[in-house]
Structures are given as structure tokens and as C-alpha cells.
């Protein structure tokens, strides 16, 4: 919904003026900016008529910054200061970068997000991305003749909180007002759905330079409902380049490469990959700074063989997304191809074989995301009615809390439509407990140790009560950008604590896919472990309550009764050290049975105390 500003009488400034808004596809390899003109979404070109801006930034020794084509031209001669594919570093730590040995950059191992040492000093991926976005803003304002009111920035559907927040920070650093972070497959669906007036179930297969997403959507009467999403936030065209790069090293048997030679071979590898989209073979030549040369022919067949495992890595998440949506491949009406990497013949053939239909490619896969983002920006800026279509996007992984015993309590299940808010009540574990630690988790496993930790905060000021009496309501809120906020409120006093979840860095390579795979693989073991931990927590509570009662009212028992209860406690503690949750359950039942008489005497004694000195009619 667009926000309206109310002006003084006579001071209204063009209430029906078209507001300038854009959609930006901040890609691993290329970045594009688009807008809506006369009702049609168009990609904005630079002065040379080029729509694609290479996502490359160079920091020169003289302090100047090159972005796009000038930077790309320098990547072989100045590899240390020319940053390529910076999107792969967004929201990630140095330990998360698998191919770090082959990269020419000087990484700084700082806490949180990785940083890079350049001629202009240490730079974060947020700062580097901001330079790209700044140039996009300048291109748009020059082309549209005014200042932008805002932009919709697209992100991979599998970007986590840290990666999304890093993208938003980069946009704000570039002077952009972020109207919305929009998932790339959803943006593509907008462009295709409105362009083709389509209805039915569609798959959006999005393979970019550094990320892969698969989304299953239902399009019906202007409603874009994401049924399921899956993918890999560190799989893309760059990985195909790496396979060709390794093949080149085998062909040339070179001495250890300098940074500039490594960048040269990577560039040649990308050129060869792109040439194979149109030809059955390509000649690959290179001359290194050492004078070493290579001259070899790469065939489409060899390329397909060396990259087959990467293609397969895209199909595994596709199967999971279909399973989550409760659909078979033959129930999908069409497959939308997004991202420049989908031009590879091996990708198109694999998708066609999997879905048993020819994928849709009538929109440029490089431009379709930016076009959809521009359409959404036009709505959010208030230039057209928001009832033309409705976006129902989802979160990729469940969100929840750690409870006693190291268990995971899911509050928002994965594939829940966003924006959303869910609340759940929790209580204290110990008598007199006045504080609670809230540990926010992301993942599908039953134990907290197997899920990703997002944030921790404490709620203090809980009034001291017996265990289980306090009521703490924990509320999870996920906004339309997919960003999470969590609050905890003690119901009787109103004391509250909250946190905006901003982890220090994002999910590691394939973490989300791995977390989902582990959840399926270990489901039975996890359920057993959960049952065991639940019984241990219950046993701990019973033992603590029994010992407190013995300390207070042990005089109500004779020696034999006291010994029986102590034996029951000891037996239960021994069972708690074992792996059998059913045995612990039986031990709990046995101790409860042993203490039944003791509990009855305590109750009778307390009733007598309450009635002492009272008249009978008081209790009528």
C-alpha cells in the first residue's frame, strides 16, 4: 500500500504525478535496472545502449573506483583490487567460502562478514555492492529525469536473514529507498504471469551466476502464491566456470599460478562456457605471464560430462520443492527459465527431461527478474492499483525457539506465506525463575544443536512464581522482505524484550539444502532424541519438585517411606543416563506412584492449616 502525504491547503504538489521507481536485479554476474513506462516494463540501458552492467568493482591505487565494464577490463591485470561476483560473499564468513584458494583476493579474517583488502583499504561486500547499486541509481535517474522514490531489489529466494539484511544495507548505502526485497523467482513469475496472462502451477528454475532457486507457484486471477521453494545459495554459473578452469589446469600442467594468471584462466573458462551455448566445440587458448601457453579444444560433450554433477545438484532441490508442494512433475503447467546460466544447453535439456516439457524461454532470462521487480516497484510507489495482483511469498526454513532439554519448538513452519506473525506461550522451568533466555533458531531438526542459531536475548523481570505458573508470550514477525523480529512478553506484568534478528553472517555453502536433507535423513533419529529429551526434562522437574517437598515436609514420612522415595529418585536418575525414553517414562510413573501417599498427606495437612480457626459457615 502506498503512503500518502497530506499537504497544507493550496500546497499540494501534483497529487497524481507519476512517482519514479525502479526494480533492480543485483546479480552475481550482471546487474540490471528496469522501470515501467506507459504501462510497460522496460530495462534501462547505459549511454552505449547496454542493459547489462557487469557486477565488477575495481579500487584503483589513485583512489578512483571503476564499476562495470571498465572494472571488468582490468580484472586480469589488477586481480587483487578487482572484485568479481561479490554477491557470493554477501552475509557470509570467510570459513563459508569453499573455493577461496582459487580466488585472487586478499581476504581479511574479521569477525562476522568476510572483508577484502584493496588499494582503497579494507572493504566489505556491502560497500562493494553499494558501488554497483549507486551506478544503477544514477543510470535510472539520468534516464528518467528525476529523483527516485524507491526501488525493489531482488534477492535469491534462499537468501537468509543476514544475506537479505546485507543487501538492504548496500542499497541504503547507495542512496536507495528500499520499497521491498523481492524473491527473484517471484519477480520472474510476475513478469511471465502478467505478460502471458497465465494461470495454473508453474515452476521457476532460476540459475544465476552464483545462486540457484527453484520455486513452485500457483498463478490464479492475479494471485501469485508460492507453494514451495528450495535451492542452493552458493551454486551457479561460477561453479561451471570452475570446472572448466580445473580442466584447463589439467590440459596445461602449469606451474603455480599468479593471481593475474588465475584470473586470466577463469575469464577464459567463462568465455569457453558461453561459447558452448552456440557451438558444439570451442578452442581455448591462453598465454600466461610466465610464457607458458595452452591450446586445447573443449567439446560440448566433455563440458557436459565435467559439469553433470552440478546439473544434478539443481534437480535434487527441484524434487524437494515439488514434494513440499504436494505435486508431481507432470502437474506443472510450465517451467520458467531465469538467469543467464539457463542458456547452457545441458541445463535446458535436463529441465526438459525432468518436467517432460520444453521450458519457457520467450522472455530474456537475464532481464525477466528486473522486469518483474519494476512492475512490483510501480505498484509500491502508488502508480497503479495494488489489486492488479497479490504476492504470497514464503519463508524457506522453519523458525522456532530452543526449549528445555535442547529441543526445538517450531513457531513458524517452512513454506509459510509472508508477511506473517505467530505467537506461542511458554513458561518457566524452575520455582522462583525471574529471567528467561530466548534462543531463536532456524531449521527443520528436532534438537537445537542441529539447527542454525539466529539470535539470543533475555527477558528479565519475570515475577517469582512456582515452575509452570508464569506465562511468557513469544511473538515471531516476518516482514514482506523476509526479515525476522522476535519479542517476548510476560503476561501478568507486561515486561517485554525484543530483538531484530541480524546474525553476524549468513548460511554457509549449501547450508539450507543440507539442513533440509538432514531433516529428512535423520527424522526418525530426531524424533527418538526428542522423545528422550522430553522425558529427561520431565524427570528433572519431578525430581526437583520431590526433593523440595522432602526438604519441607519430610517429617510426614517414616523411615521406610523416605527410603522408598529416595530409591525411586536414584533409580530414575540412573535411567536418565541411559538411551531408553520408555524406561524413563516408566521410572517417572513409578516415582509418581511412590510419592502419591506423601502428596496426599501434604495436601491434607495444608487443608487442615487453612481451616484452622475458621468457622464452618466460612466454607459454605
From Swiss-Prot:
InterPro entries (alphabetical): ATPase_NBD, Heat_shock_70_CS, HscA_NBD, HSP70_C_sf, HSP70_peptide-bd_sf, Hsp_70_fam, ISC_FeS_clus_asmbl_HscA
Keyword terms: ATP-binding, Chaperone, Nucleotide-binding
Lineage top rank: taxon: Bacteria
UniProt GO MF annotations: ATP binding; ATP hydrolysis activity; ATP-dependent protein folding chaperone; unfolded protein binding
Alphabetical list of CDD domains matching this protein: ASKHA_NBD_HSP70_HscA
Entry keyword annotation includes Signal: no
Pfam families assigned to the protein according to its UniProt record, in alphabetical order: HSP70
Signal sequence, renumbered to the chain: none
Gene Ontology process terms (BP): iron-sulfur cluster assembly
HAMAP family: HscA (MF_00679)
PANTHER family: HEAT SHOCK PROTEIN 70KDA (PTHR19375)
Family: Belongs to the heat shock protein 70 family.
Protein function: Chaperone involved in the maturation of iron-sulfur cluster-containing proteins. Has a low intrinsic ATPase activity which is markedly stimulated by HscB.
Name the record gives this protein: Chaperone protein HscA homolog
Lineage of producing organism: Bacteria, Pseudomonadati, Pseudomonadota, Betaproteobacteria, Nitrosomonadales
